[in-house]
Regions:
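Conserved beta-strand/short-helix segments
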Residues: 22-510
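N-terminal secretory signal peptides that target proteins for export/translocation
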Residues: 1-6
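Bacterial N-terminal signal peptides
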Residues: 8-19
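Short, low-complexity, Pro/Ser/Thr/Gly-rich segments in the mature regions of secreted, periplasmic
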Residues: 521-528
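Extracellular carbohydrate-recognition regions
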Residues: 509-521
Length: 529
């Protein structure tokens, strides 16, 4: 299968992942207790059956699709067979309530049951590879964007980089929300024009770029041709699209390219909206994880652009964060997250380099946080985090700390908090998630903690990659965000069939505080209260 991977939007955080080998099989996943929920295709009330390679949970997005004040959760399974086509992909949507996640109210989408897609399901399309949620048409209901980056629409001429064949052009579905939820009869499909290709929909985000109250749709195309370095190279592009009253998506302006990037830079590999511009004005960040910086190949960089005119506001490399250095294959810009960690009203930007050799340990990973200011993102006000900041065992080779990021106000104190996925952490890539609180002085390094599947009532599994995908949103409408954790390599009904955990108010002091451990596994198949 082609490579997979994470992206974010303010408040609504989405993610996707890179698959690895799967391990031994485990049992099905039930839905819920008072603190945590767990869902797979084998959960009671969920349509479908887990099968090997489904990768359920490979993409996640929270949005309020029915406008009831409680967030809803979209889950991508890009390896799902649909219409008899292997790896065609499908998306599940579970609706939230004051009681949390309920598997009884769901919708399932694939390319065969949505209008406007003449090609329908095809093997290898991977519909649901990336997801994003937000209100694009301004009607008060969030809409859902679904990326299908490996859709086959032959691209004429040229050679393709990005380890993709030239027919991996891709497209994006936009399903509109309503009082009854997502409306499968009201769908737009955006496809590249002419010879433009390059895995459209590999990353997605929705946010308001022009201040009119309606969200723009940001589409990452990391394998696309662009004018760069005095020529046309496959460095990647990013497009911001707005909803037009005639029922179409139109460009909001800007070039959609970074003129300073080279062939195979993969700009648009990850994207994020935020108030990154002067005075907190809206802009977007895009990661180019393969960009060469100061002679270091594939060390990566992040560009911040004004989405309306395409002006490059800032380019960030690891050397912009104090004494941090660039090295080949760091992949800085692999994952991005937006949050106001110090509560000053200006958005801050977290950017990961999960293959960074921290303290000499290969591919252990680092995350860089640049704080916002009245003049925009200020990399001179920064923090650098790694596993070493959490005490306990030191970093190990292949931890990939920061391979997924999610930001939101998890503890309800008014400051955004930051979660880090480390899917390679633990024996045989079991995976861990790390967490730090926000505060008036920023992220509180030294007061964070980590957890794994057993912390949430599950069981360790080799190669599960717990934490490969993260997302945050307010599932129960109480004003504080929940965390969703995708485990797309989990063996529920077959190797790498996948599952998703959702947890709220996680705190080391209450993880066993609601009594579920005394009841054994029974609560984990109970109906959520």
């Amino acid at each position: 299968m082609p490579q997979r991977l994470s992206t974010t939007v303010p408040i609504l955080v989405v993610g996707f992942f890179v698959p690895f080998a799967a391990g031994a099989q485990t049992g099905a996943c039930g839905v819920g207790n008072v603190r945590n929920w767990c869902v797979s295709q084998d959960s009671a009330g969920v349509t479908g059956v887990s099968q090997a390679g489904d990768h359920f949970g490979a993409a996640l997005a929270f949005g309020d699709f029915d406008g009831d004040g409680a967030g809803d959760l979209a889950v991508g399974a890009p390896g799902e067979s649909a219409g008899g086509a292997a790896n065609a992909g499908a998306v599940w949507v579970f609706y939230g309530s004051a009681a949390g996640l309920h598997a009884g109210r769901e919708q399932v989408f694939d390319q065969d049951n949505l209008p406007g897609d003449d090609g329908g399901t095809e093997s290898g399309d991977q519909f649901g590879f990336a997801l994003a949620a937000g209100d694009v048409d301004g009607d008060g209901f969030d809409d859902l964007a679904i990326g299908t980056p490996f859709e086959n629409q032959p691209e004429p001429g040229g050679t393709c980089g990005f380890d993709l064949s030239c027919d991996d052009v891709g497209h994006v579905h936009l399903i509109f929300g309503s009082a009854s939820g997502l409306d499968a009869g009201r769908v737009l499909v955006h496809t590249p024009e002419g010879s433009e290709g390059g895995a459209e929909g590999y990353s997605l985000a929705i946010g308001d770029l022009d201040g009119d109250g309606d969200g723009e749709l940001l589409i990452g195309k990391p394998g696309s041709m662009a004018v760069s370095l005095g020529g046309t190279v496959r460095s990647g592009r990013v497009f911001a699209l707005r909803y037009h009253g005639s029922g179409t998506l139109v460009g909001s302006g800007g070039s959609g390219q970074d003129p300073d990037l080279e062939e195979d830079a993969q700009w648009g590999f990850a994207v994020a909206f935020g108030g990154f511009g002067p005075g907190g004005s809206a802009a977007y960040a895009a990661g180019a994880r393969h960009s060469t910086v100061a002679g270091s190949t594939r060390t990566g960089r992040v560009s911040i652009q004004d989405g309306l005119d395409g002006e490059n506001l800032l380019e960030l490399a690891q050397t912009d964060y104090g004494s941090a250095g660039n090295a080949a294959e760091d992949h800085f810009g692999f994952a991005l997250a937006t949050g106001d960690f110090d509560g000053d009203g200006f958005d801050d930007l977290a950017a990961a380099a999960p293959e960074k050799n921290d303290a000499g340990v290969g591919d252990s990973g680092r995350v860089y946080v640049a704080y916002g200011s009245p003049s925009g993102i200020d990399p001179s006000q920064f923090q650098i985090l790694s596993i070493a900041d959490f005490g306990g065992n030191p970093p190990d080779t292949g931890d990939r700390f920061g391979a997924a990021l999610a930001a939101g106000d998890y503890d309800g104190d008014g400051f955004d908090d930051l979660f880090f996925g480390s899917p390679g952490r633990g024996n045989d890539d079991r995976g861990f998630v790390y967490f730090v609180h926000g505060s008036a002085s920023g992220l509180v390094i030294g007061a964070g903690f980590n957890f794994s599947e057993p912390s949430l009532g599950g069981a360790f599994q080799e190669d599960a990659l717990f934490g490969a995908v993260l997302a945050m949103g307010d599932l129960d409408g109480d004003g504080a965000d929940e965390l969703a954790i995708g485990v797309p390599e989990k063996d529920t009904g077959g190797n790498a069939s996948g599952l998703v955990y959702v947890t709220r108010r996680f705190n080391p002091n209450w993880i066993f505080g609601d009594g579920f451990e005394s009841a054994g596994p029974a609560l984990w198949s109970a109906t959520a209260p």
